[in-house]
Amino acid sequence: MIPLSLSETTLPTVTTQAPDLDYWLLSPLLVVFAAGVIGVIVEAFVPAQRRYSIQTALAMVAVGVAFVLTLVQVGALPADSAGLTLAFATVVVDRPSLFFQGVILALALASLLLIAERRDGESAFTGQAAAVPGSEEERAHVLAGSQHTEVYPLVMFAVLGMQLFTAANDFLTMFIALEVMSLPLYLLCGLARRRRLFSQEAALKYFLLGAFSSAFFLFGIAMVYGYAGAVEFAAVRAAGSSGGLIDGGEPLLLIGIAMIGVGMLFKVGTVPFHNWKPDVYQGAPTPITALMASGTLVAAFGAMLRVFYVAFGTTVAQWRPMLWVVAILTMVVAAVIAVTQRDIKRLLAYSSVVHAGFILTAVVAANADGLTGAMFYLAAYGFTTVGAFAIVTLVRNPDNGAEAGDLTQWAGLGRTSPFLAASLGLFLLAFAGIPLTSGFIGKFAVFEAAVAAGATPLVVVGVLSSAVTAFFYVRIIVLMFFAEPAENAPRVLKPGILTGTTVGLGVAATLLLGILPGPVLEHVIPQPAAETSEAVAAEHTAADSLFAR
């Protein structure tokens, strides 16, 4: 019988549930996002002569507030809680994510100090990005003293992507965070005030190779989804234990792990996915290079640790051999090539590649010590790197005012600018892993975790690579303090308040983390809870014991 009216029809009851958006827990991300949006509005409606001061204050206040909110959330997170999931379990708030966000925000604030520095009325960025290098339009903008203040909202969106990248709880959210982080950086790399063609070439290379790696990452997600039927990390982990949706589907998982690994290893900059780093680091504005070499590396490794320790935590035997090979190639190849470099920014780029290999030894360990060791290493390396690039911005060619990249021009710097030379020497010693610096504690932590996991051959390669890298670090120190100043000696600028603060922050962090690492390792970096039960204690030594799922 066909019902004659709606009253005779029984409709199903539909229950809808609003998403669990805890704005307080998401506040560090929301503050940075709001600053980026407001910055765009400022560019649209505020007169050009007032934008610099407004954008600088807005960006620094937003990052500072987000950092304080992150610290408050660390203290408010219950001691017996692994963490919380928000927004349909797409975002996670746990101790590792809060730690990585705090480090990223601190490094972003230090980089913003370099970005905001102006010398003789000029910043490190071109006056008009759309101008063709060498054109009349560009010269007009240079003569007018134009400031490209759009860099501030772009930096805010990049920092937002870095934060979300480390807090994503599924692959789709992580991919979105990857693009939010990467797209602004592609633009920022092409905005250098000097050597415009070189800067735009670096941006183009970074964009093309970045798009290539993103495609690998996305195809890997598709493969994992075909195997697990889900993109949530917890569901992928469960599928790895149970065998997936279909019999014989393990090749899908292995291909997915490999392709996702390629996408993430590109962002980290390991061999053989490192070729973009030297060109981009050299061509990009140095303040942006500082942000990429520190914040982006922290974000990429933070995301990698979550993916391999949580989503692929039950398939360690499948992905560990791949990372073994990549780590060895990265440490050996990058260390050898770095010895031949004659440009300071390219040398620091290859140094970054080598350090990525060192951190990979902690990832390979796949235990809680590896996680905490990698976290300490990333924090220590980040502050040292920002300080080193801050000094690079101060050493200029006497003829055109561009940065003095050739290492021969740094000869005798210890005589003309002893404070800057001593600061850079300290940073180089930290990169080399000399005792009483943060680099020594970081290397000791990651190598100790690798030895405990049975990766002693990997540690041997790491120690030998450290010896090779120490050669070119010490070579620069000898050049600065014991060589005669070059005929084309550079003009060393007096550090402004902003740049001086960045250098001082780097020096303080390098010494404090090297001399007093205990407070950071015990109170800042999360540790597995102490348990009396042997079974529970064994569980807490697992690589994923500190992550929320």
Swiss-Prot record:
Coiled-coil blocks: none
UniProt keyword list: Cell membrane, Membrane, NAD, Quinone, Translocase, Transmembrane, Transmembrane helix, Transport
Function as written in the Swiss-Prot or TrEMBL entry: NDH-1 shuttles electrons from NADH, via FMN and iron-sulfur (Fe-S) centers, to quinones in the respiratory chain. The immediate electron acceptor for the enzyme in this species is believed to be a menaquinone. Couples the redox reaction to proton translocation (for every two electrons transferred, four hydrogen ions are translocated across the cytoplasmic membrane), and thus conserves the redox energy in a proton gradient.
GO biological process, alphabetically ordered: ATP synthesis coupled electron transport
Catalytic activity: a quinone + NADH + 5 H(+)(in) = a quinol + NAD(+) + 4 H(+)(out)
Organism: Thermobifida fusca (strain YX)
UniProt family annotation: Belongs to the complex I subunit 2 family.
Membrane association type: Multi-pass membrane protein
Name of protein: NADH-quinone oxidoreductase subunit N
InterPro entries (UniProt xref): NADH-Q_OxRdtase_suN/2 (IPR010096), ND/Mrp_TM (IPR001750)
Taxonomic lineage of the native organism: Bacteria, Bacillati, Actinomycetota, Actinomycetes, Streptosporangiales
